[in-house]
Amino acid sequence: MSFKQYRSIDLILFVIMYGVCEYLAIKAATVWFDEPYCISIMLPMLAIVMMRWDRYSIIHAVVYALLFVYFQSGSLTQYFIYLIGNLGFMLLLLYVKKVTKEKIRATFFGSMSYLLIGFLLMEVFRGLASMLLAGKDAGVIFTFIMTDMLSLVFAILVIIIVRRIDGLFIDQKQYLLELNSQEERIDGGWQDE
């Protein structure tokens, strides 16, 4: 399998996982329990995909926003608000480039800073989009942050867990090169001369 094929399969699997989990979370909150709150898996999934695939996570930012609003039966304005919010999250790539994925992964503080900055970017851009497209006042940014606080707590827990799973919260190109290097060392030790 080529690297491009691996990346494509991985990206597709993350879209499917997101779609299923988000659909179930939204239906649980709106249909099964009729509560106004729901925990979204969007933030941790975007953070994981960005860590794995850098700029390719923009595909997920767009698809996740579209699926989220679709599952909520949202309006056209909401589509734009969530698209803009998720594209705001993509500014996190600048942080990743400056700090490096290795430093982000290396410590709890690095991973949580990465997640929190992404969360704030997403919420601020959603708020700004709401101000521009729906005529909301600046308080809408605070509203977005507060309504998504449960999702942030959930995202923190997810990132704590995935940091401990080998190969999940890491740049995939680097990870595959490391695996290949380990394989060559192991195989090299067993070759007959």
Regions found by a protein language model. Name each.
Residues 28-36, 75-85, 95-193:
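Membrane-embedded alpha-helical hairpins and interfacial helices in multi-pass inner-membrane proteins
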Residues 60-82:
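Membrane-helix boundary elements
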Residues 19-22, 65-66, 86:
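Residue-level recognition of pore/gate-forming positions within transmembrane alpha-helices
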